[in-house]
Amino acid sequence: MIKNGTCPFWERDDLSECARREYIEFKFPLFILLTGMIYAFCKVFRAFYLRRKNHTNEAPEFEEQGNGNHEYARFSVLRLKSAWESRSFCNVNNRSTFDKFKKFIEGAFIVLQLTIHLYILSNMPMDNKKFFHQGFLVQMFLWILLLVVITLRLISASQSFRWVLACKRDLWAVSFYSYASLFTLSILPLRSVFIGKIKDKIMVKYIISETFIDLALLLLLSTSSIEGTRYSFLVENENKKLPPAPTVFGLLTFSRIDRLIWKAYKHCLGNADIWDLDINNKSIAILANFEMSSKKGRLLPNIICYFKAVFISQLFLAFVSSFLNFVPSLLMPRILSYVNDPKSQSWNLVSLYVSSMLVSKIIATTCRGQGLFLGEKGTMQLRTVLISNIYSKTLRRTILKDSTTSLQKNASTSFEENPDSSEAEPRKKSSRKDNSVNNVMSIDAFKVSEAMNTFYLACEAVFMTVTALMILYSLLGWSAFAGTFALLAMIPLNFWCATFYGNYQADQLILTDKRTSGISEALNSIRVIKLLAWENLFYQKIINVRDGEIRLLKKKATIFFLNHLIWFFGPTLVSAITFSVFIKFQNQTLTPTIAFTALSLFAILRTPMDQIASTVSLLIQSFISLERIQDYLNEPETRKYEILEQSNTKFGFEDASMEWEAAETSFKLKNISIDFKLNSLNAIIGPTGSGKSSLLLGLLGELNLLSGKIYVPTVESRDDLEIGKDGMTNSMAYCSQTPWLISGTIKDNVVFGEIFNKQKFDDVMKSCCLDKDIKAMTAGIRTDVGDGGFSLSGGQQQRIALARAIYSSSRYLILDDCLSAVDPETALYIYEECLCGPMMKGRTCIITSHNISLVTKRADWLVILDRGEVKSQGKPSDLIKSNEFLRESINNDSKNTTHNQIDLKRSTTSKKTKNGDPEGENSQDEVCAEVENFEETKMEGSVKFSAYKWLADYFGGLGVVFVFTSSAILIHGITLSQGFWLRYWLETGSSGSKSTWLYRIVEGHSNIYFILTYIVIGFVSSFLTSGKVWIAIISGTNVTKKIFAKLLSSILYAKLRFHNVTPTGRIMNRFSKDMDIIDQQLIPNFEGLSYSVVVCLWIILLIGYVTPQFLLFAIPLCALYYTVCTLYLRASRELKRIDNINISPIHQLFAEAIKGVTTIRALADERRFITQSLVAIDRSNAPFFYLNMATEWITYRVDIIGTLVLFSSSVMIIMKASYLDAGLAGILLSNAFSFTETAQWIIKVFSSVELLMSSVERIKEYTDIPSESNGYISPPANWPQTGDVELKNLSLRYSPHSSKALDNVSFKVKAGTKVGIVGRTGAGKSSIIAAIYRLSDWENGTIIIDNKDIKHIPLERLRNSISCIPQDPTLFDGTVRSNLDPFDRYSDVQIYGVLSKVGLIEECDELSLISEQEQPNFSSHKLRNRFIDLNTVVKSGGSNLSQGQRQLLCLARSMLGARNIMLIDEATASIDYISDAKIQKTIRETMKNTTILTIAHRLRSVIDYDKILVMEMGRVKEYDHPYTLISDRNTIFYRLCRQSGEFENLFELAKVSFDNKR
């Protein structure tokens, strides 16, 4: 009995009458009345007061800061928010008509309640009138208050009471608070009615009616949308679907997602079915709030500051949930006491205990669900913050070297930076590789964000541990502290394991970065790798790194085993120590009630121990990832906003010196003074490596400015510039040497955020010679260019990049060698019609080029560079007279400077894919066919059984899986025997023995015997369970090793067609995210699933065996369990797949930003790209958000079902109390306690397994792709001995639906013959190389080399027998030697010989270099070139070399192997004409007996060859000596020579060659 003053609160088994009258009917309602009235009055008065003051001018939501800071203007999210809102519209999810009708019903119930009060008050007996008047009057006033509140809520729609809208939500809150409180107060009186404690009929009717009305009002309000909340959505698409308006019931039980789950059950979901996010969860709002709350400094304090409200809410919910979770354990001793002696307590009281268990678990489940969902929502928001900050940093990060070394501690230092780098290359100057940067976003950001989920679990674990220990102390006394000390002793072991685990994790991340970098490099260069037959080389390099990862995974598995053993054995050890101390030192009797209550508490303690251990492990990983993110955010940023000076009259340099890096060997531009002519064409020329590209990058502010000044028209953001009357802005547009395109349509790439003007667009297309290409494409300007433009030819990519600059509103254009990728005819057309045409009116253009004769014709200003210095500048006509280099270059270009008229209505050609359809000879139909494949397909339905079987086969088959599952059944049987052993111990009565331990050991059954046996059973069970997990993980690691090797082999040896139509990012997703899932998540989840299923089956069978009546509850509960699980699994599967697909665009945008950051910054378009990233993040967040809501939806329902299992078990136990002993009842309740958690775990793990199995499906899909057909007849070792090549009736198409790239091609090349292959872009030239290398399967025909049909020769043997110099110079991360001779087949003398021949080192230095290899002393030997020694670092893609230098190094690589056949694909396009002439001379002199097939746009390069093969539309049109063809006016070759602008020179060279060979 609990007393308060003179009024007892509880009498025997019910609430006392005076307590009901004083507290339930008076004091508590009075408190509700006063708090509700004060709160409502304050809110209404405030709203009325503000309305009267008519505060219509609201303060701006965000204050502008740093208005003079151009960098702030470009990157501040606060500045973006207003622009975002102006482009979108606000859609408000209004209340339904039915919700409005419910308010009238609510008012009617309140009136009814007042009527009932008046009726009872008027009919109350006089002797009770004074007391009852007090309580009734309070309740009447409370209902009058609620009537006023509902009235105000109803009249808020009236124009006369619009001020009420401001406090409508507060009024709604008062109503809900009152209804919920009143219903809660009515529960105990209603119980008194049911058990017959209240006899008065009027009071019985009153209590029943009051409870019913309170419940009805509560249900009405809980199921109606929350008033006063403008649940609005900032959307870009009017058709975007909105979720149902939130209700209290929907928020608490997650029923708000019911419609989406039901829709997913009926059919597969698509992106269009996913509801939009509300404004508060939009990325722009999240980032704006984060930016306002953040201070300069480290990321972690800012994250804590921003999410402090979430943390506090989770802390409170964890406290409530943790306490309520122990209510069943507190009530368990009373239930077991009743089972032990049914007469000790009344049935009413025991039924109250059982009901209290049900209610407490439901409330605890609700609090836990809300706490976890807050964490999951925080995960989404933190992920948004991290990804956005990383993306924004990428747009600010410097392109220069040594911006960081945090991810690559062992990275080598480059010998010199690229003086003539292209767009893709400058961005790679950082020593952090782009793929490592991508890991920061794709892996580290996700790991850190997942830590938000752990905060609630960590708080819950702490509270549960403390509460459990307090209850244990009250139950066992000070012996509970013995167990506590044992528990604390395990914490250092946990931290020791966590420390080792974290160290291994950090080492693994380094290897993962290295592996993904290697894979990305291989994928980006797959065509060259196949041409060089280096698949095995790259396969072995990647596998070696992977082996290191596998070793670390196994070490982590061992640490996990130790940690797992501690987790499982901990409760056994703690309970054994506690019981021993309790019996021996406290001399207490251990009863079943005490023992099984303590065991239930120890079982509950296992959960927080698990959570603490897993939380520590996850937090360590998260902190490691956070440090990596912090390191990235701390990297140096571009200084362009500081070093560029704005000027309206000057554009250029004033005594400026610039460099790539602060190193002696770094390339420098020295004392540059150039004043470019405004509204004119300015040309920059110079030999290869002179610094032309670096000069342009310096003008853009991308290099380090050592001294001097750089003047540009503006440094403001593109959005802030005013458009002039001519439609132009004072901004710059940049077109890089290597074209940079975004994934999207041709229109997207050209318009690039500008306003679309059809006439202007058509004019730009025509001037850039793209109009014919567009017409040839089925989709026209809507043709998707693919990943990096891989569906287009190199020429088309360059022209689209140029068109983007021309179409822009920029008045200043900076073009880096944009004419080298097109044939001479197209180059001349673009120069005349575009660069010197009407599109350039009022514009200033700066262009670099090797085509000196072309660009100098109409240039107004010419700058000549050499070795980073301006040698001369001025008008071209003046410089030609005085500059020897210029005069020599023009003479080499053309002795006839008068070009012939060309047909401006020329036809352009079709496309070329990035890696495989080299010149794009496949038709535009193929483009459209490929475009259909650009979007990643979403798997539908459940994961196929074939995927499970495929994975099981790697484990050894389904038999191994069966054995593994059977072992789980046996092991848990051992675990259950612990409880039965304890029951047996207690039944023996030995616990009360007073004999000495030594004597009883001799005699037999002593306490120590039982305790030691109990410990042994627990240890064996824990060891076997942990060992099973360890075996599973180790086996899984071996399986993932095999799967990775299979996947890598499948990708590397796949047909080139696969790489053409599959974006690199999609393939990388398999190697990174999907492989990481199989490595670290899938197998542990499989093991956890099997264990949880076994546990649940054991529990159900145990309870059903002891109390068969339980099966009556079990059947409907299982049916309900199955139903909700089925609904959830289908919905979660669809949402997860959409989430996986929607993440890819974020990776794509990030990869594009890395490659194109120079172009983006030049256009001052950072703000638009940040906005695009936010849109992509929102599209990814939507399915992620609703997936988490669906997860909590199922968790809540499974918890409720588990609570019902506990409740039904308890009911069965008290009903069969006379037939059960307390020990058996304790075993049943202990297991029933764990059923909820285990059942919930099954759903989570099973859904996780199915979701994770989608990664297996995706990987399996890529292991089944067709590989290249291999030959089976090995030719002789010296094949090809002579070099005869013959094509017979060869036809080739790149896809079944495309036109023929080669159509019945036949020609023969004799050994030692040099053949030039010419023709317009897309004529089929590069398809010949593709056919000879068998990069694509032929439709028909044969290719004979030295009397061998190459179709039957093994691919590696074939490709190793032919040398090739591809059009795109591809180098790999390593050294000069590893790029030239990765297999160490050649000596230094041979390597220096080819370097000398291609002009990378001077001939006089060759012997010096060889002698210095033994004792290098480069300080005393000054080189003119950048190659210090053969171990000089070459970065991935050759990014630290100029385009020309890369091409020369590739030429040296092909010349190193003495092969009898060489294929050259436009290998000198990026080299100046003088160097080109020298290289061609070298080729002719050193390869006299080699058969050479050269594709060339520069006709001068092949005019003295033995034969010219003219291709057109995939057919051979002409094949003869150059002189023969050029002498015939009717030949295509004659027309090509005429259109080149140097006909007379070509004719003379051809004639000399012809005469020399007669």
Curated annotation (Swiss-Prot):
Residues 651-892, 1285-1538 form the ABC transporter domain. SMART domains: AAA. Residues 410-434, 892-926 are annotated as: Disordered. Residues 892-901 have a biased composition (Polar residues). Keywords: ATP-binding, Glycoprotein, Membrane, Nucleotide-binding, Repeat, Transmembrane, Transmembrane helix, Transport. The keyword GTP-binding does not apply. ATP binds at residues 686-693, 1319-1326. It is found in: Membrane. Residues 51-103, 152-169, 223-302, 375-449, 505-558, 606-953, 1035-1082, 1133-1199, 1244-1558 are cytoplasmic. Glycans are attached at N4. Residues 311-621, 961-1251 form the ABC transmembrane type-1 domain. InterPro entries: AAA+_ATPase (IPR003593), ABC1_TM_dom (IPR011527), ABC1_TM_sf (IPR036640), ABC_transporter-like_ATP-bd (IPR003439), ABC_transporter-like_CS (IPR017871), ABC_transporter_C-like (IPR050173), P-loop_NTPase (IPR027417). GO terms for cellular component: fungal-type vacuole membrane. Its main location: membrane. GO terms for molecular function: ABC-type transporter activity; ATP binding; ATP hydrolysis activity. The keyword Transmembrane applies. Residues 1-29, 125-130, 191-201, 324-351, 471-481, 580-584, 975-1013, 1106-1109, 1221-1222 are extracellular. It is a multi-pass membrane protein. The chain crosses the membrane at residues 30-50, 104-124, 131-151, 170-190, 202-222, 303-323, 352-374, 450-470, 482-504, 559-579, 585-605, 954-974, 1014-1034, 1083-1105, 1110-1132, 1200-1220, 1223-1243. Residues 424-434 have a biased composition (Basic and acidic residues). Belongs to the ABC transporter superfamily. ABCC family. Conjugate transporter (TC 3.A.1.208) subfamily. This is ABC transporter NFT1. It comes from Saccharomyces cerevisiae (strain YJM789). The lineage of its organism: Eukaryota, Fungi, Dikarya, Ascomycota, Saccharomycotina. The gene is NFT1.
